[in-house]
Amino acid sequence: MVGVEVYPKNRLVSANAEQQISVTAIYSDGHTEDATHIATYEANDKEIAEVDDTGHVKFFEQPGDVSVMVRYLGQVGVYQASVPLGAPVNVTPQPRNFIDELVFAKLKRVGMPPSAVSDDATFIRRVSIDIAGRLPTEAEAKTFLESTDPAKRDKLIDTLLASTDYADYFANKWGALLRNKRSSNTAMRGNYAFHGWIRDSLHKNVRYDEFARSVLAASGDMGQNPAATWYREVKTMQTQMEDTAQLFLGTRMQCAQCHHHPFEKWSQKDYYSFSAFFSTVGRKPGRNPGEEVIYHTRKVAQTANKKDGCLLYTS
């Protein structure tokens, strides 16, 4: 068997509605079989809906999104549904970008009115805290509130993003995400160098893909190439891959180590093939006590699936 097909895949349903899910098993020779009554089901939010052993879903009055995971012979499918709040959404703010368009479309679909556009005083306070990690100065607030420039909000955002306050604030955030912590006194040189590298990258507005590549492909001494400090805290292929997926791709892969990811398309094969990318990472003692030199060996990137021992490669 190569997969399962769940029908319907997603629906907008009313409160207290019911839905029967059907499950079809798909085999490599092209034939299919009904697996509805032998698959297993699990809802991820039992306050919104519950599902029985036959795939019959019962919704409650709680609005929101719910997913029902369907498992059969190691394959996974998902049914997704939304119970709308039900309020009329006739007017939305003017979209400023494609993210606004997607958000407003979702709000209309689930009947959730958007918040009103904030006033100028609220905006400058919020955006200063969010971007620079501080309240606006008296001079900044006075200049902004007195301005009649229709583009003043965009200009304020650009000014804050170009400031050292932004670089300082987000360097702390990224430092935590990249596990830049002092595990010992001998780690201090790498810690300070890595923090400075992150801060400078943000202040120079280094492209996101370039920033990620510099971390993942880092090699050498941690004092000379601070980005290599990341490898000091994430030592195994699995940890390196899981951190990479979550930090840079916004995807949690942990579940796929043992089985198909319950609410995503990722399989065990994907998990170990991705992990294989880091199989070429090596380390050796550095010149200073407690430090390491990171290097990448010249070999085929591969690892074995722990379940069946099959070798998998990074494609």
Enumerate the language-model features and the residues they cover.
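Short, structured secondary-structure elements
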Residues: 61-68, 82-86, 90-311
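Extracytoplasmic soluble-region selector
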Residues: 1-104, 109
